[in-house]
C-alpha cells in the first residue's frame, strides 16, 4: 500500500526526492561492468538484490566516496554501518587517534577523505593536539554531524567568519560548493574566535540559510533549541552542541541514543554467525581477546555472487603512537 506521502507528490518529485535515478544509474553501470558474472544469475535477480541492498543499507560497503556521499540515504547507511562494524571499540573502552579512526573509515570506504576525519576530530578535540585519543562515542557523534551535514557546515563556517569580521548578517553571502572549498574553517586559536559571536544573531543567519539549504540541514527548531542556553558561542562550540543534541540525532535517524550505542543484539547474533563461517578466525579471536578491538589490516573476504559489484581495495594506516587521552564527553 502506498504511503500518504507518496500519494501527495507527483511521480517526478517523488523519484527526485528519493534519488531513484541515482540508484538506477548505479545499478545499470554495475550491471554492464559485471554482465558476465551476472548473466548466470539473471538480470531480474540482480536488480532485486541491488535494491534490497539499498533498502538494507549495505549497498555503500566498499564503494567509492563519491557514491557513499551521493544521497542522504547513503550517508545514513554509511554512518550506521560504521557504528555497527566498529562499536566493539567503544564497548571495550578503547581510545583511538584521529588517524586510527580514519583507518577504520577506509576499511568501509577505501578513498574516504582524510579532511573529513580531521574536521570531525577537531569537534571533539577543540584546541587539543590532533594526535590526542578519543572515545568511540565522542568521535562517532561528531563524525555524524560533520559527514551528514558537510555542505551545510561549510556555509555555516563562512557565516561565522563574516560575523566575526563585523559584517551585517543581512548581507551575508553564502558560498557555493566550489567557492566554499577555498575558505578555511575558523581557527579557535585566534583572539576574535575565543569570544565567539552573539548566539541570537548567529541563529538568525542560520535560519535564513536553512530556508535555502534543503539537502543537508538540521531542523531549524532543534538548532534554535541547541543555542537557547548560551549568549555567545564559538564555531566549534556550535558543532559540539549539535553533536550532543539528542533531538538532532533522533531526527537524523542513523544512530541510537548515546545510552544505547553499545547495544545491538541482532548485530551481535549476525556477527557470530558470519564469524563461524570464516575458517580459523574464531579461534584466533578467542585466543586473543584484544584482537577483536580493531579489525585486521587485511580482513578476510567472504565470497558472494554479488561481491564483484563492490570495488574493495586494501588500505593501510599507522597510528602515531600518541599516549594522550581525552575523557568521555558527558551527554
Swiss-Prot record:
It is found in: Cytoplasm, Cytoskeleton, Microtubule organizing center, Centrosome, Centriolar satellite; Cytoplasm, Cytoskeleton. GO terms for cellular component: centriolar satellite; cytoplasm; microtubule. Keywords: Cytoplasm, Cytoskeleton, Microtubule, Phosphoprotein. Residues 1-111 are annotated as: Required for interaction with PCM1. Residues 288-331 are annotated as: Disordered. It comes from the Eukaryota. InterPro entries: CSTPP1. Residues 1-225 are annotated as: Required for interaction with TPGS1, LRRC49, and TTLL1. The keyword Phosphoprotein applies. Signal peptide: none annotated. Residues 112-331 are annotated as: Required for interaction with TPGS2. Residues 318-331 have a biased composition (Acidic residues). One of its GO terms (biological process) is regulation of protein complex stability. One of its GO terms (molecular function) is protein-macromolecule adaptor activity. The modification Phosphoserine is found at residue 319. The keyword Ubl conjugation does not apply. Regulator of the tubulin polyglutamylase complex (TPGC) that controls cytoskeletal organization, nuclear shape, and cilium disassembly by balancing microtubule and actin assembly. Regulates the assembly and stability of the TPGC and thereby modulates polyglutamylation of the microtubule, which antagonizes MAP4 binding. Belongs to the CSTPP1 family. Interacts with PCM1. Interacts with TTLL1, TPGS1, TPGS2 and LRRC49; the interactions link CSTPP1 to the complex TPGC. Binds to alpha-tubulin. This is Centriolar satellite-associated tubulin polyglutamylase complex regulator 1. It comes from Homo sapiens.
